[in-house]
């Protein structure tokens, strides 16, 4: 099979090395005489893998000891509910930054539990820019500030971390593990797995211990961070294969040199693609340069009537899943950790040829 580069926004491309390892181990995990999908989550082999999974993530991200790491289900969407359930703690207000599709969904769910103060809003500029933090309208009575560091659909990414005197909550689904992060600045970090962590079915939550133990009354027991922490994220049967896939991705990340090395790789990949877009009158990106995403790169063709032909030719050249989200249009290249520089080079070369042949 020839090399195919998958630019899907999620579920996304996995490292080839990880896929091959998963293939090799599919029928028998370790000496269990069974697939990892078939063994109990209480099996000593699985428990050992789960413990290493957490330790590898702690090592990669430098997670302090006074933070719990939870491996949950329900996607980031479940966290839109779990965050207010766990963090309101007697307060009736929370601050949310509205910078795109996913932060809007978090806001909608947050309103079910409290009064939401939208402290900054990028909808007026169609999610192409972010206001400087000095202009934000933070309600000091809010229980927390929630923001989305990288908006997958618009390709809009913060280049700063908001500094507030309240717990900071971040939906890092599409940026986690792409660079180093100072976890101590956050009260809660959460991320669904199907972009930079592994496969769908797993959501990672990193929560500071002093924010646990005071949930809203009459809520599902599974939505209590303390319940999950006290049961090692196994109050119910976990998504075992998703845990396993993440364990293999974490090992791969360590082999690449960790997150400082990945940051350099990701910066180079993004620069290669943005340089090609910026140097062309045929392609464009609407996002303010300062806030362009490393992970998700939308680009528009000057002649929209060529969109379908572009996608058809791209697939023929083994460049797949480049269609942009319907709210933005055009194309979108999602270039998470697993996308190698060679994939970016192939895309850029194709874009140049396509431009030459269609102008």
Swiss-Prot record:
EC number: 2.6.1.52
Ligand binding (L-glutamate): 42
Enzyme class: transferase
GO biological process, one term: pyridoxine biosynthetic process
Keyword Cytoplasm recorded: yes
Pfam families recorded: Aminotran_5
Family listed: Belongs to the class-V pyridoxal-phosphate-dependent aminotransferase family. SerC subfamily.
UniProt name for this protein: Phosphoserine aminotransferase
Originating organism: Ruthia magnifica subsp. Calyptogena magnifica
